[in-house]
């Protein structure tokens, strides 16, 4: 959770009053004009349990050795699942998608893969996330498979004020 809050604070300090702070109220997916979606809003993880949920995801990642040394197809499947869980966690009032992309990119990089987000259209991303919220991560897997490549060891993720741990 510390890394997610540090990323959020680094990105949104001076933009959001609550930058780096967990949301304190329950929320659903964004307001939409799509009647089918609006008629059945999907709630995110309960606000009072965010830290517990984050701990559970961290334990899952630890059990899976942070997705290190996995073959591509196994990595894509496991990464899509973790990405979905983090999306459902939705720890902040705003800015979750950007935080998730950065955290996910770092997780992938540390596991030996890089993600090229430049080729992902906004609607493709949103559609894949919403399908995953309903239990189908196949669109996320397809998207990640298309943008995944072996890691460039010289790539570094820098965000001012974010303690990134040991140098890569």
Regions inferred by a protein language model and the residue ranges of each:
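FIC/Doc superfamily catalytic core
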Residues: 1-168
């Amino acid at each position: 959770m510390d890394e997610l809050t540090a990323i959020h604070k680094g990105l949104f300090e001076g933009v959001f009053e609550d930058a780096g702070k967990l949301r304190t109220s329950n929320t659903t997916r964004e307001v939409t004009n799509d009647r089918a979606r609006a008629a059945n809003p999907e709630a995110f993880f309960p606000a009072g349990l965010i830290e517990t949920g984050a701990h559970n995801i961290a334990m899952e990642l630890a059990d899976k050795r942070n997705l290190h040394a996995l073959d591509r197809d196994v990595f894509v499947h496991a990464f899509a699942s973790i990405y979905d869980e983090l999306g459902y966690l939705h720890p902040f009032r705003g800015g979750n998608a950007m935080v998730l992309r950065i955290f996910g990119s770092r997780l992938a990089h540390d596991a030996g893969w890089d993600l090229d987000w430049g080729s992902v259209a906004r609607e493709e991303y949103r559609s894949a996330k919403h399908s995953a919220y309903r239990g189908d991560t196949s669109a996320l897997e397809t998207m990640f498979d298309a943008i995944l490549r072996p890691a460039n060891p010289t790539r570094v993720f820098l965000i001012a004020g974010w303690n990134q741990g040991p140098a890569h």
